[in-house]
């Protein structure tokens, strides 16, 4: 399928409105054109600083604006992060993602995160961070330290965004993605479904992502995990079929991107997840927790992979890895 960055909302809506089986069939066809069938990229996500975030994202347990009963934690030691990364690699993860509950990293935090990137990279894993908004200098220093991916989700459509967050703008998020691109890193950016948004908002989110100058290399599609004490604690749960439709449409309009199953997966059956893989999802977060929300554990994931005949993708060699191999030849 031809790579496009000029999708219209009308075209994306037409995909959403296809009969479900036709949509999933098309998505699987597109997936097999661009990726190895039955292979899933596995990532692990670790919270390196938890809670007391100054942002007011209405879905988030880490926001200081809400009483979610979350116990805040200070930055964890780099040595602890490396230990967790080694365990993740041993369990089959090819990418290690590190997240901090910050609006943006302060300059005093930069030596800490840069050391972390270098140490995890030295393990032979792909590296990813989500630290909030970045400026251009911070993005460039992260790239120089060896960071492969930077995650900064758009969360929802531009139109619905102000219903969810007021402490940073939609364009603030786009600016950070631009800084990441200019620095030469890969982009991880997606959103959350089930926030009380309409299908038109889900279309709007995917339209924003698919019309970026370069599609995000990874697109996480989160299902809201309602957190007691947050404004969205009692929001009506989105139908799983609608979530899978969103995955399928994302696969079709961003054919080269990894489509990742993220938050909300622990509540899904094996059959639901199998349908999501059929719809073109080819990445997931493994481990018992995603930052502060529960997640399917590694044992459950391996059992699911065995049941479905899936294998975990191996880490891709970096330019530096290839250079070392060439020198050794």
From Swiss-Prot:
Stored PROSITE patterns: RADICAL_SAM
The first-level EC class reads transferase
The record's listing under SMART domains reads:
BATS, Elp3
Please tell me where [4Fe-4S] cluster binds in this chain: 53, 57, 60
What is the reaction catalyzed? (4R,5S)-dethiobiotin + (sulfur carrier)-SH + 2 reduced [2Fe-2S]-[ferredoxin] + 2 S-adenosyl-L-methionine = (sulfur carrier)-H + biotin + 2 5'-deoxyadenosine + 2 L-methionine + 2 oxidized [2Fe-2S]-[ferredoxin]
Sorted alphabetically, which keywords does the UniProt record give?
2Fe-2S, 4Fe-4S, Biotin biosynthesis, Iron, Iron-sulfur, Metal-binding, S-adenosyl-L-methionine, Transferase
Domain Radical SAM core per the UniProt entry, residue ranges: 38-262
Xref: InterPro entries:
Aldolase_TIM, BATS_dom, Biotin_synth/BioAB, Biotin_synthase, Elp3/MiaA/NifB-like_rSAM, rSAM
Q: Which GO terms describe its biological process?
A: biotin biosynthetic process
Provide the binding site for [2Fe-2S] cluster.
97, 128, 188, 260
Q: Which cofactor does it need?
A: [4Fe-4S] cluster; [2Fe-2S] cluster
* Quaternary structure (record): Homodimer.
Function field = Catalyzes the conversion of dethiobiotin (DTB) to biotin by the insertion of a sulfur atom into dethiobiotin via a radical-based mechanism.
Q: What is this protein called?
A: Biotin synthase
> What organism, scientifically named, is this protein from?
Acinetobacter baumannii (strain ATCC 17978 / DSM 105126 / CIP 53.77 / LMG 1025 / NCDC KC755 / 5377)
Q: What is the lineage of its organism?
A: Bacteria, Pseudomonadati, Pseudomonadota, Gammaproteobacteria, Moraxellales
What gene, per UniProt, encodes this protein? bioB
């Amino acid at each position: 399928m031809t790579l496009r960055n000029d999708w219209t909302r009308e075209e994306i809506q037409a995909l959403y409105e296809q009969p479900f089986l036709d949509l999933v069939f098309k998505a699987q066809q597109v997936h097999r054109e661009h990726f190895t069938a039955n292979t899933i990229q596995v990532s692990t996500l670790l919270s390196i600083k938890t809670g007391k975030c100054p942002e007011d994202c209405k879905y988030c347990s880490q926001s200081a604006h809400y009483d979610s009963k979350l116990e805040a934690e200070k930055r964890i030691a780099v040595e602890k992060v490396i230990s967790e990364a080694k365990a993740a690699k041993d369990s089959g993860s090819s990418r290690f993602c590190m997240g901090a509950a910050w609006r943006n990293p302060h300059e005093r935090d930069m030596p800490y995160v840069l050391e972390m990137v270098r140490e995890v990279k030295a393990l032979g894993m792909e590296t990813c961070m989500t630290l909030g908004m970045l400026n251009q200098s911070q993005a460039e220093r992260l790239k120089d330290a060896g960071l492969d991916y930077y995650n900064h989700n758009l969360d929802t459509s531009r139109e619905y965004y102000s219903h969810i967050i007021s402490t940073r703008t939609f364009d603030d998020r786009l600016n950070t993605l631009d800084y990441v691109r200019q620095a030469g890193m890969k982009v991880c950016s997606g959103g959350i479904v089930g926030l009380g948004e309409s299908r038109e908002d889900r279309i709007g989110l995917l339209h924003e992502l698919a019309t970026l100058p370069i599609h995000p290399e990874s697109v996480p599609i989160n299902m809201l995990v309602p957190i007691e004490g947050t404004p969205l604690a009692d929001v009506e749960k989105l139908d799983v079929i609608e979530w899978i439709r969103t995955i399928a449409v994302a696969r079709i309009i961003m054919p080269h991107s990894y489509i990742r199953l993220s938050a909300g997966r622990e509540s899904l059956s094996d059959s639901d997840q199998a349908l999501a893989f059929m719809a073109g999802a080819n990445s997931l977060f493994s481990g018992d927790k995603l930052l502060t929300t529960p997640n399917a554990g590694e044992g459950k994931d391996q059992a699911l992979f065995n049941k479905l005949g899936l294998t975990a993708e191996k880490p891709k060699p970096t330019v530096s890895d290839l250079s070392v191999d060439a020198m050794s030849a």
